[in-house]
């Protein structure tokens, strides 16, 4: 049923099978208490918001009409965990900035970062990446096989890892920051379109790379590239 809420300072310790199956994709369940998933959690239909944090060694799955949302608190997905849900969202619907540390398998169709900090510390893959806020962090490589959209307000990519846009890149956020030693790659043969906003490579070591045979289009008045980082053009600019 829509609007179910689990509240409090206690813990939901799932070692079995936890299923969320609501009437339609717009209905929501909010878990504001802690939740540890060491079994399986399957969001079949609707939105499951995890806002109380937790430590996870189990699996997260989900259907095409479902969203698994890390909406607050500190979540640690250990090396033995897996996220293969269709749609995953990182937000700040609940109190606190929120941090999600992903050290296990991550292979999903769509990833959306609205707020929160998503730390990808192992090789990860998503079909689509949309970042309109928040921070993409971590030490691993996140490979986007479809469209990468960096849009909306201010947002950050940081850490020592790599974000590979291997299916096209659209950049039109207000302030798009690459920090620390993060590298954003426009993959070989792909097209990047920077149509709005300010791109900031803020520190030495932060890199935007346009690979060989890739095309990087800059259009629109007032585009600004700032900072002490590097634009490494190996393709067509």
What is the predicted role of each segment?
Residues 1-237:
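Sequence/structural signature of small/polar-enriched beta-strand/turn repeats
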């Amino acid at each position: 049923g829509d609007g179910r809420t689990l509240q409090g300072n206690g813990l939901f310790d799932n070692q079995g099978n936890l299923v969320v199956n609501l009437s339609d994709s717009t209905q929501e369940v909010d878990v504001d208490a802690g939740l540890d998933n060491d079994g399986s959690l399957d969001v079949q239909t609707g939105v499951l918001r995890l806002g109380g944090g937790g430590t996870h060694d189990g699996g997260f799955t989900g259907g095409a009409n479902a969203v698994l949302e890390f909406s607050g608190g500190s979540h640690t997905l250990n090396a033995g965990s897996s996220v293969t849900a269709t749609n995953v969202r990182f937000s700040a619907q609940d109190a606190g900035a929120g941090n999600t540390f992903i050290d296990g398998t991550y292979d999903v169709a769509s990833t959306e970062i609205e707020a929160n900090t998503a730390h990808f510390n192992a090789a990860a893959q998503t079909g689509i990446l949309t970042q309109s806020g928040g921070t993409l962090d971590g030490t691993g490589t996140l490979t986007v096989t479809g469209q990468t959209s960096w849009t909306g307000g201010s947002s950050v990519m940081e850490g020592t890892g790599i974000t590979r846009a291997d299916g096209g890149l659209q950049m039109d956020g207000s302030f798009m920051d690459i920090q620390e030693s993060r590298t954003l790659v426009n993959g070989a043969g792909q097209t990047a379109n920077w149509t709005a906003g300010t791109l900031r490579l803020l520190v030495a070591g932060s890199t935007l790379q346009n690979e060989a045979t890739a095309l990087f289009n800059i259009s629109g008045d007032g585009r600004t590239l700032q900072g002490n980082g590097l634009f490494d053009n190996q393709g067509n600019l």
